[in-house]
Amino acid sequence: MSDKSKIMEWIAEAETTADASTMDIPKRAYNDRLVAWIDTLAMRNKMRESDDAEEIFTIMGRLQNYVENACENLVAKGKLNYLQISDGFIIVADLDCVNELCEILCQIQWQVLFYSQMLLRGALTAGKVSMSDDSKLIIGPAFIEAFAMESENAIFPRILFANEIKDYIKEDEIVFSYLKKDSDHFIYLDFLKYMIDKEQITTKELKHFLQTQGVKRLLVEGYSKNILKSKHLAQKHGWLIARFAEYKIKLS
C-alpha cells in the first residue's frame, strides 16, 4: 500500500472514531432558570487608583465570602450555582427558589454596605441559561438580560426585579414581600426594609450601626464630594440617603 493510501485510511479511521465519540456526548441545552447579576460600584476606580494588589484581593475575597455564605444552603441542595467575575457575581438558581434568592440578594447587599462600606447594584430575571459542567462558564440570553438591566437600568445601588420573572413563575408563588416600585417604575428589592424586619432592628440601633460602621460617612461624603463635579456619582449616594430617610433615618 502506498503512503498516500495509508494516509487516506488513517484519515477515514479518525473520522469514523470522531463521529462515534461525538454521538455519545449529549448536546447541551438551555434551561429556564432564575439569573441574577450583581456588581459593586466604584470598584474599577479603586483598582485603577490602588497599587496595592493585596488590598484588592482582600476586598474580592470578602465579597466572595458574603456570596458563599448566603448561598451555601441552596448550593448544597444542588439548586443554585454562582460564578465570580472580578467584583461581580452571576447567580443561577432553580425557578422554585425565587423567594429564597430574593432574600439571599438582600443579605448580600446589606453585608456589602455595612461590612465593606461599598455600594452594590444588580438585576434579577428569569429565562434561558446554560452552565458548563464545572460551573466556570455561564451562557444564555437570561444572563445577557440581567447584565444589561444592571448596567443600563439599575443606575442606583438597587437590585432590580424583572417583569419577565412572572412569565416563568406564577404570581401567587412569589411571596417575597419586599418588592418596591421606584419613581421610574422599576421594581427593586427593598433590602433595607427586609433586613430591618428580619433582624428586628430599631431606629436607634440602626442609627448607631450606620455611624459605627462608617456607612453614614460613606454616603454623606460621597454625595457632598460629587454633587458639583459628578452628579452621576452623587445621585447614587443620594438615592440611598433618601431610602434611609423613608425609615426615619436622616443622614444629611
Protein language model regions, located:
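Intrinsically disordered, glycine/charged-rich C-terminal tails and inter-domain linkers
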Residues: 2-25, 155-252
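Short secondary-structure capping micro-motifs at structural edges
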Residues: 106-110, 134, 144-148
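A general alpha-helical scaffold signature found inside nucleotide-binding enzyme cores
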Residues: 58, 103, 140-147
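A structural signal for short, well-ordered beta-strand segments and their strand-loop junctions
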Residues: 37, 119-125, 158-162
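Short, electropositive, low-hydrophobicity segments enriched in small/polar residues
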Residues: 46, 131, 144
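Catalytic/regulatory signature loops of cyclic-dinucleotide turnover enzymes
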Residues: 115-117, 143-165
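Catalytic core of nucleotidyl cyclases, primarily class III adenylyl/guanylyl cyclases
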Residues: 72-100, 112-141
